[in-house]
């Protein structure tokens, strides 16, 4: 979808070269399209089949030629075909009409639910907000999830890296965050599927419908818009679909003045797509074969994710680390932009501790006394030191048993186990699987609960009372119920 075209639109050019997803196009003298303009081919190939393709201008080569990257497959294109300058960048629909729908990089619906009745469209390329528009005072973004709010709090308008393998609960955590921002913050979410599996994209859509995040009966009551450019798409689509999702999120922030969650899965694929077309665009490869513009490309995307005085975009980005090498230029460049990391741990998931967020590996720049306050900071550090001591003692316990520990260490282990259990929490979006009502826990309740456990006030309660509850009051009530059942 392309915005209303200016007078220069409609200039016809001729395709002179096609190499994979990259086209060289010749235009009449003095009528070259601008960088980032969308070019459109609508014709028939030699077999008589319809060919419809959009490409984005990347370079002006001289001799009245431009080089463009295709947003879909270039099958069927031949030299000499006509291609038209639309006179504007790729534009996508924005606003409430996008909720509950799935779009491709061009803003075209791909969910077979009919056309989108959007009242406005917006170009995917725009500048980051000016410094004068930014909300520079750090503010914690409360998620209602205990382990995140206490140990690795998110910054409103910040960027969070989500690390985790398959099957440890990434999708459920994403769904819960989408649900909580809608209920507690009156906000909406945008999900950008960048270069991941088509099956996962479909599964996510079905799970969103199942959990009520997408209301299939009344799409206007949905809480999320989806924008997909999956693994099977050409690199042009994977390189730009993140910007399409971001543009939809910016409208909710700037026009509707809402708090928005932007999910990008996976930010590494955005970089990978850029590196795929970089050499074809004639650029000299940089370290490990990445594009020389790596820092610029990532920065242009990340700097648009910000908190303004009108609203905020808080971004949660899944980060794939190639060969687990954190020094690889792609993840290393991404880390420079992150305010927090949420690491999901398979060992915790196998114990049944959900969400399986690692309390020791997850980090946040917000966890400092000047931002969160002394009590929150002290409680978080005490929780981490208790869990760290428990981790150190686990080898001794495995070899010699619990009885060989000193009195102090036994007390630490007992409290650490309760803390670990209390870091679990029933989710709203998982109610249909667990049969337990979801819980949103306020930050003050979270801090108070962990303080009571660490102070020894609840040493007399059984461990099981702390598992999959919301606030500490629920743990006490569960303990009474357990005691009554065992009498």
UniProtKB/Swiss-Prot annotation:
Q: Briefly, what is this protein's role?
A: Produces ATP from ADP in the presence of a proton gradient across the membrane. The catalytic sites are hosted primarily by the beta subunits.
| Residues making up the signal peptide according to the UniProt record | none
Among its keywords, does the record have Iron? no
Q: Which residues make up the binding site for ATP?
A: 164-171
Species: Parasynechococcus marenigrum (strain WH8102)
Q: Determine the domain of life of the protein's source.
A: Bacteria
Query: What is the membrane topology noted in the UniProt record heading this document?
Result: Peripheral membrane protein
Question: Where is it found, in Gene Ontology cellular component terms?
Answer: plasma membrane-derived thylakoid membrane; proton-transporting ATP synthase complex
Could you say which EC number(s) this protein's record lists? 7.1.2.2
Q: What is the lineage of its organism?
A: Bacteria, Bacillati, Cyanobacteriota, Cyanophyceae, Synechococcales
> Which protein family is it in?
Belongs to the ATPase alpha/beta chains family.
| MF-aspect GO terms | ATP binding; ATP hydrolysis activity; proton-transporting ATP synthase activity, rotational mechanism
Answer yes or no on keyword Ion transport. Answer: yes
Q: Which Pfam families match?
A: ATP-synt_ab, ATP-synt_ab_N, ATP-synt_VA_C
Q: Which reaction does it catalyse?
A: ATP + H2O + 4 H(+)(in) = ADP + phosphate + 5 H(+)(out)
Q: How does it assemble?
A: F-type ATPases have 2 components, CF(1) - the catalytic core - and CF(0) - the membrane proton channel. CF(1) has five subunits: alpha(3), beta(3), gamma(1), delta(1), epsilon(1). CF(0) has four main subunits: a(1), b(1), b'(1) and c(9-12).
Where does this polypeptide localize? Answer: Cellular thylakoid membrane
Protein name per UniProt? ATP synthase subunit beta
Q: Keywords for this entry?
A: ATP synthesis, ATP-binding, CF(1), Hydrogen ion transport, Ion transport, Membrane, Nucleotide-binding, Thylakoid, Translocase, Transport
């Amino acid at each position: 979808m392309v915005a209303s075209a200016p007078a220069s639109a409609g200039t016809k050019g001729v395709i002179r070269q096609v190499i994979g997803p990259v086209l060289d196009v010749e235009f009449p003298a003095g009528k070259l399209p601008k960088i980032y303009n969308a070019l459109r081919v609508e014709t028939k190939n030699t077999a008589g089949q319809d060919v419809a393709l959009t490409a984005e201008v990347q370079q002006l080569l001289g001799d009245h030629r431009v080089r463009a990257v295709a947003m879909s497959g270039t099958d069927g294109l031949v030299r000499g075909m006509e291609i038209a300058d639309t006179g504007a960048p790729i534009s996508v629909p924005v606003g409430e009409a996008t909720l509950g729908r799935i779009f491709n990089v061009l803003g075209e619906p791909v969910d077979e639910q009919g056309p989108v009745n959007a009242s406005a469209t917006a170009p995917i390329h725009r500048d980051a907000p000016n410094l004068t528009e930014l909300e520079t005072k750090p503010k914690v973004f409360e998620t209602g999830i205990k382990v995140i709010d206490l140990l690795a709090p998110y910054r409103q308008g910040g960027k969070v890296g989500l690390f985790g393998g398959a099957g440890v609960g990434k999708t459920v955590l994403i769904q819960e965050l989408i649900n909580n921002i809608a209920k507690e913050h009156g906000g909406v979410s945008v999900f950008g599927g960048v270069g991941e599996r088509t099956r996962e994209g479909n599964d996510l859509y079905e799970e969103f419908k199942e959990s009520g995040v997408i209301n299939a009966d009344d799409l206007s009551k949905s809480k999320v818009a989806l924008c997909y450019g999956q693994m099977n798409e050409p690199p042009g689509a994977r390189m730009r679909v993140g910007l399409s999702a971001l543009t939809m999120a910016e409208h909710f922030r700037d026009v509707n003045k809402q708090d928005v969650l932007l999910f990008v899965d996976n930010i590494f694929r955005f970089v990978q797509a850029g590196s795929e077309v970089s050499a074809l665009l004639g650029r000299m490869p940089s370290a490990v074969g990445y594009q020389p513009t790596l820092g610029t490309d990532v920065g242009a995307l990340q700097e648009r994710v910000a908190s303004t005085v009108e609203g905020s975009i808080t971004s949660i980005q899944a980060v794939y680390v190639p060969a687990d090498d954190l020094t690889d230029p792609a993840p290393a460049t991404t880390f420079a932009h992150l305010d927090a990391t949420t690491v999901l741990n398979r060992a915790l998931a196998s114990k049944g501790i959900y969400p399986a967020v690692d309390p020791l590996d997850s980090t946040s720049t917000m966890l400092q006394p000047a931002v969160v306050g002394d009590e929150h900071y002290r409680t978080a550090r005490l929780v981490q030191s208790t869990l760290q001591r428990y981790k150190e003692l686990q080898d001794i316990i495995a070899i010699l048993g619990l009885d060989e520990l000193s009195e102090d260490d036994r007390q630490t282990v007992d409290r650490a186990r309760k803390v670990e259990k209390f870091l679990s929490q029933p989710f709203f979006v998982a109610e249909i699987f667990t049969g337990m009502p979801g819980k949103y826990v306020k930050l003050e309740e979270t801090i108070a609960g962990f303080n009571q456990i660490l102070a020894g006030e609840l040493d007399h309660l059984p461990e099981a009372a702390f598992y999959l509850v919301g606030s500490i009051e629920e743990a006490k009530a569960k303990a009474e119920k357990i005691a009554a059942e065992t009498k």
